[in-house]
Each structure stands twice: as C-alpha cells, then as structure tokens.
C-alpha cells in the first residue's frame, strides 16, 4: 500500500515521527510537506494530499494539523476524497470498513503520539467491507458529489 502523508506546521512534529514508524512497518510512504515548522496554511497540504490520491499516486492519505478538523474540511472539498477525523481506533477502522475513507485526519494538539500510531495502523490495516448497504450509501455520496461538485 502506498501512503501519502502531509501536515501543516501544527502537525509537523508528529508527521516526522509517524512517517518513520509507517516506513518501519513496510509501507511505501511519500512525504509531501510541510518540511519546516514555519507557519503555513493547512488547505495547501489538504489539496496536495487530495490531488495525490485522486491522481493515484497513493492508496491512502494521512493529514495532520492541530485538530484534524481543518485539513478534513479542506480535503473533503475534492471530488472522490472521503476524509475523516479520527481520534480513536474504533473510528479509524469503522471509517474505512463502512465509508471507504481514503484520507485520515489527525490532530497533534488533541491526541498523544502513541494513540496516533495506533490510529494510523488501524486505519491502514482496515478494508472496505463491500457490504451492499455500505456500497449503496457510497453511491449516494457519489451522486451528491456529481450534482454539487461541478
């Protein structure tokens, strides 16, 4: 699985640590920024991840900011992106199994690094269930995207 990771300045410290952890578990990981702790704008990182996923440069994305919310809001503005904020392991697997989330959003100021690790590996190991009820709901989301994201 190819993983794309990015953060703004508020998520930079976790990104550096977690990037190495993900690689050590055998995942192919691409870091697309930010590369310093200088203040930057989270919508830019969300756009970078969204475009990478849309253009098949990665299978899943991980975005880290202060709360996880800002990057989630921005990433979800892209057709085909299903970004979810997860601050527990249940949400991390359920969001993939039921909603086929392709971008995990975390808040460095919200959770500890150990929990962040657990959430990331839970997210990466989870698989979409393909249950008819979940696929039906995803089809409805696609219809909403097609109607509203022109």
Label the predicted regions.
Residues 38-47:
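Structural motif
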Residues 28-39:
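A short beta-strand-loop structural module common to alpha/beta enzyme folds
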Residues 4-6, 10-11, 89-150:
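C-terminal binding/interaction regions
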Residues 20, 47, 51, 73, ...:
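Alpha-helical segments flanking ligand/cofactor-binding loops in enzyme cores
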Residues 48-85:
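Helix-adjacent hinge/juxtasegments
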Residues 25, 78-79, 99:
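Short, structured coil segments at secondary-structure junctions
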